[in-house]
């Protein structure tokens, strides 16, 4: 989500990004659900709220607290969703964050 949001903001062609990402993801089902629809203008491709993502990442961070390098990466991802929740976007679907709201 973060990568597609940044690409959208930078006016990078989402189809080209998706084509490259598919090659490295092993044709990920989650990527396909999000990207196919987002490229067509439908940002509701991944039915999981930002609030739920933040909750899950909070649990993951807690599990990783004894692995500092892994926890740092997880914390960075969590901060993206925390910022969205703080801006009142918690009820959006995570894939809706691709669009600039």
Question: Where would I find each of the regions flagged by the language model?
Answer:
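Helical "substrate-binding/catalytic lid" subdomain
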Residues: 1-101
